[in-house]
């Protein structure tokens, strides 16, 4: 889990200002204005916590301000020099992590209760750096990943006591990340897990290592080191066994999770090299190797099928209710096969191009390759769509609740896809969106008047009949190449082909194909997540969960506007509140500073600006 995606509701933090677009705009309301000269001397940066409070760092310390009144709630004079790049809200909780460098001593990391300013954890002189975290509400803990120079550590933080339970050392970091041990990088070093055995032990895997850890004390009960990085680490509660495998290895290992004892049965041997291990809804272990795939009965560790199912270039197996979909990935000889629950082939269909995305739908297998896209029918293995759809990149995806169809847009063309019937219709053609190419990581949202397509700097609306209502690209100050960032995400997700677009669209396709017809965005998930975290910390009465719950509830309301920062031809900077249905800037805030500090709160529709590093102003944009 990456820290930059950890908010369960949609707040956009903005570090630069941009310019006003001309036109007559409705004036915004100034809610409050606070001079920070006396309290902080000079404001270095501002952020917003999950409870809505504004966190301001200055020469005289770190302060929490009530976002509704601007009044100081707490101040920590000892926290001078807090590093903004290290600031990270902890999802669903009124907690945040930050680092600061005291006048004397090493850089410290702190976890703060944003509503009270209480320091719940301080690394002090231990020189720890928190990288990322895992919320584990069933266990009532937050598991923090930390580093100390070139050493990996885990910390268990109790939600009931709001304090550290234990810290355990996992050993020296190997490879490139060793150079980043004490930097502010937020990437997780856990590749598999965290997961828990029947006895409650914590199991994690990273690179070539697997660990069994006492979840109560942090004691490492056992560690296992493979020859190469682990491809899979799967725990089966049915037989209380842990399955480990290294990619392209001819060995599968089974461990007893309490002591890490090797209990691999002699009869469980690979015929080829390991590609993957996963599980299905029937609690079987799915073993995928170069010589085919088979099922392991977790009760006996025997192979269930007499003969493994094999196709050339096998790379992925997708379990589903009716059986298994085997995907062979090759640019020239790819194929997709349907295998029933007994291991019998129902059909095997050749596919043009390298398949970088496949999922099951009600009618068949939806796939996207570098050459074409279609649905292969479960009934006969033939294409459902009369004509192939060729996507140059991952399409923008949303769902129309009224028409009950998936909406996809890519390369000037809009498609309506009925998951129930498998029908695909083109509803928009030759739609030219301003400065949008096939590499643009475009995302989509269904609106009452049509389909809204956007990036951080782009807005467009196409009505439901396929007519372009408006399209606009807004200049940005930063030269960051967002398409290259999107491609990096694709590579991380295992897509080793020349494909651009937003990885969020691939996730959305997965959700929709599995029946999640309501867009599963951060805003709609917020309240449920907060309630889960609140129940996990029910014994602690000072966590302001009612505040965070209210803000999450607000975030569920459909947002009619999008905030964009931009500049005009004269380099005049502004924050614009763009109406998604009209494309017009309903409100704007002009910025006076060359490098201003501000936060856009999309939940309460407010903008907080710090002018001249002295005065924080709150504007209501409703």
Tell where the protein language model's regions lie, with residue ranges.
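Bacterial N-terminal signal peptides that target proteins for export
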Residues: 1-12
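Absolute N-terminal positional cue centered near the fourth residue
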Residues: 4-5, 21-24
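Bacterial N-terminal signal peptides
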Residues: 10-22
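Secretory-pathway ectodomains
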Residues: 23-622
């Amino acid at each position: 889990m990456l820290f930059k995606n950890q908010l369960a509701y949609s707040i956009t933090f903005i570090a630069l200002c941009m310019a006003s677009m001309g036109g007559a705009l409705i004036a915004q309301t100034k809610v409050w204005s606070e001079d920070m000269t006396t309290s902080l001397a000079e404001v270095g940066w501002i952020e917003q916590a999950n409870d809505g409070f504004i966190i301001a760092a200055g020469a005289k310390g770190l302060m929490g301000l009530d976002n509704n009144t601007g009044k100081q709630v707490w101040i920590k004079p000892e926290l001078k020099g807090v590093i903004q790049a290290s600031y990270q809200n902890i999802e669903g909780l009124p907690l945040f992590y930050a680092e600061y460098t005291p006048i004397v001593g090493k850089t410290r990391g702190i976890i703060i209760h944003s509503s009270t300013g209480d320091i719940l954890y301080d690394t002090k002189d231990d020189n720890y750096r928190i990288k990322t975290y895992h919320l584990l509400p069933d266990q009532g803990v937050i598991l923090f990943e930390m580093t100390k120079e070139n050493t990996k550590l885990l910390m268990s933080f109790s939600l009931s006591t709001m304090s550290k339970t234990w810290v355990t050392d996992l050993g020296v970091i190997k490879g490139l990340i060793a150079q980043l041990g004490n930097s502010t990088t937020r990437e997780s070093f856990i590749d598999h897990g965290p997961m828990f055995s029947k006895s409650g032990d914590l199991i994690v895997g990273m690179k070539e290592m697997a660990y069994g850890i006492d979840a109560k004390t942090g004691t490492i009960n056992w560690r296992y080191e493979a020859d190469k990085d682990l491809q899979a680490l799967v725990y089966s509660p049915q037989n209380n066994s842990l399955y480990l495998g290294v990619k392209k290895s001819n060995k599968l290992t089974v461990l007893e999770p309490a002591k890490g004892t090797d209990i691999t049965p002699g009869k469980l041997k690979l015929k080829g090299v390991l590609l993957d291990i996963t599980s299905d809804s029937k609690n079987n272990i799915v073993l995928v190797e170069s010589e085919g795939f088979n099922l392991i009965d977790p009760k006996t560790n025997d192979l269930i099928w007499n003969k493994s199912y094999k196709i050339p270039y096998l790379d992925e197996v997708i379990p589903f209710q009716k059986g298994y979909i085997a995907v062979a990935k090759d640019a020239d000889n790819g194929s997709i096969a349907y295998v029933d629950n007994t291991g019998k082939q129902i059909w095997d269909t050749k596919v043009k191009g390298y398949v970088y995305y496949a999922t099951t739908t009600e009618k068949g297998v939806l796939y996207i390759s570098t050459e074409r896209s279609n649905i292969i029918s479960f009934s006969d293995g033939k294409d459902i769509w009369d004509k192939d759809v060729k996507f140059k990149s991952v399409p923008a995806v949303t769902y129309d609740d009224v028409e009950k169809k998936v909406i996809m847009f890519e390369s000037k063309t809009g498609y309506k896809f009925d998951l129930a019937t498998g029908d695909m219709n083109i509803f928009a053609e030759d739609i030219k969106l301003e400065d949008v190419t096939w590499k643009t990581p475009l995302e989509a949202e269904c609106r009452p008047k049509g389909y809204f397509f956007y990036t951080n700097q782009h807005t467009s609306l196409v009505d439901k009949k396929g007519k372009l209502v408006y399209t606009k690209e807004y200049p940005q100050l930063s030269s960051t190449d967002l398409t290259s960032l999107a491609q990096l995400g694709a590579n991380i997700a295992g897509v080793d082909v020349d494909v651009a677009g937003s990885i969020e669209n691939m996730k959305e396709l997965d959700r929709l194909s599995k029946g999640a017809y309501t867009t599963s965005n951060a805003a709609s998930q917020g309240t449920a997540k907060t309630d889960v975290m609140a129940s996990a910390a029910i014994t602690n009465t000072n966590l302001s969960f009612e505040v965070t719950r209210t803000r999450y509830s607000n975030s569920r309301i459909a947002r009619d506007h999008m905030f964009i920062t931009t500049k005009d031809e004269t380099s005049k900077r502004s924050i614009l509140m763009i109406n998604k249905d009209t494309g017009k800037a309903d409100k704007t805030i002009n910025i006076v500073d060359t490098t201003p500090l501000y936060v856009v709160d999309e939940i309460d529709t407010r903008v907080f600006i710090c002018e001249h590093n002295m005065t924080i102003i709150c504007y209501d944009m409703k």
